[in-house]
Amino acid sequence: HSLAYDAAFLYITDKQGLVHQLDRSTGQKLWTQDALRYYSVSAPVSVGPYVLVSEGQGSLYVIRKEDGQLVGKHSLGASTIIGEPVVDADTVYFLDSSGSLQSISIINQR
């Protein structure tokens, strides 16, 4: 489906809504996050210690890179995310389906 990367890993989303982390040098799969199974998920976005994905119901999900755990969900209500989020430091910016530019800080995720 789509991918993102950092210095050591690849992050891939697939058609089943799964998010995978692979070692860049060996290709070995290290974890799979299946909480969004059967959702149509966006391309992943790598942000510091997190990977972000959105789904068509209007939520942005935060996954911890270290272990693949889902650590945050930000709901947009009736709006959906259009395109891929843009990252600046710990702030994520995205356009919603109503045409509004929104932002969230992900620094305090656990």
Outline where the language-model segments fall.
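Histidine/lysine/aspartate-rich catalytic loop segments that bind and position anionic ligands
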Residues: 20, 27
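Aromatic (tryptophan-biased) beta-strands that constitute blades/sheets of beta-rich domains
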Residues: 28-35, 69-77, 107-110
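Intrinsically disordered, low-complexity regions enriched in Ser/Pro/Gly/Gln/His and often acidic
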Residues: 8, 24-25
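Repeat-blade elements of multi-bladed beta-propeller folds
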Residues: 1-19, 33, 37-61, 80-106
